[in-house]
Amino acid sequence: MFNLEQLHIAIIGLGYVGLPLAVEFGKKVPVIGFDIHQKRIDELNNGQDHTLEVSKAEIQQAVKLRYTSTLEDLKDCNFFIVTVPTPIDDFKQPDLTPLIKASTSIGQVLKKGDIVVYESTVYPGATEEVCIPVLEKVSGLNFNQDFFAGYSPERINPGDKLHRVTNILKITSGSTPEVADYVDEVYNLIIEAGTHKAPSIKVAEAAKVIENTQRDVNIALINELALIFNKLNIDTEDVLKAAGTKWNFLPFRPGLVGGHCIGVDPYYLTHKAQSIGLHPEIILAARRLNDRMGEYVATQLIKEMVKQRIQVVGARILVMGLSFKENCPDIRNTKIVDFIKALKEYDLDLDIYDPWVDENEVQHEYGLAPIKKLENGLYDAIVIAVAHNQFKTMSAQEFQALGKEKYVLYDLKYILDKTESDLRL
């Protein structure tokens, strides 16, 4: 029934997750990469990737891959992989709109014998409770009779050149035992690290959502410890280094938890828990604490400026870094923006410098205009917010030179020695 020789893959969504997947599969089997944005299709046809996840050489190696924004081009595909975003709304509830729209599109070209695999992070049950009914309604086909489904959660780490799609172990699952075997077989075409076949779609969904929830809770604990140690006038990094000498102490650091995964996924799990009458305590407490860190960091900076007799109103602040993590242009759900918003309440001037981000995207998403280059002697405070390689290679003297005669240097990322900055998280 399912034959690798007849495999024709469609990747729905060509962002940070979909493109690397499409490129790897495109080296082996016929693949069509579909994206609703024609600008993205044109960019990829020119061998360019603004996310910087895939190089031009890698794109050129995918000789069996072509790109389209035309749904009709997918009618000959028989294995659909959905990699669209799953954000939250303003009320921190799951926004499944992209997933529903993708399912609606696939339903229009779905045929008997086709398989639809979802990679987008969701709560346990979402694939079968939300996506499958859409596919059935639009296609007129019956689930597990005419078409089938699978779930294989993405584990892409944007900006990470060491952990790539092929060398990260992949969880797979299917709606029947036979489909699960076939989905696993398909992914093993490209996943060198191997696969783990989960016993059900719900198990695979749950596994993904707790991966990031666990990280979020652990970082929240360290953030809370940082708040305590700051009050006690103890350097947090010194404490973590000392505690880290024990073999089973987990190596987490305090910070602003943003991005499309860690700061979002826990809300998918808590939404599902609340829908069945459970109220998660630890997960939501961790989220609240991590969401407040931007405001806390801003307050700490203002306090230090006041302590050093630096005029706050009208002060000029430099924020170095805007992306949600180092060496990556991704600005989705970056918590640096929360920090910036909190600072703006003090009626001061802000410059943002980040050599990785796209200026137009920043302007469109947040209404901010990053500066293009650094100038010395301009700032009342300098904040190292993201540990880009460009910043890590700068000396303490280079950071200090950016300040006026009197200034505050706040190192959020432990780039400098503790003696070389005024504040650390």
Each predicted region: which residue ranges?
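Structural/interface elements that position substrates and couple domains in central-metabolism enzymes
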Residues: M1-L425
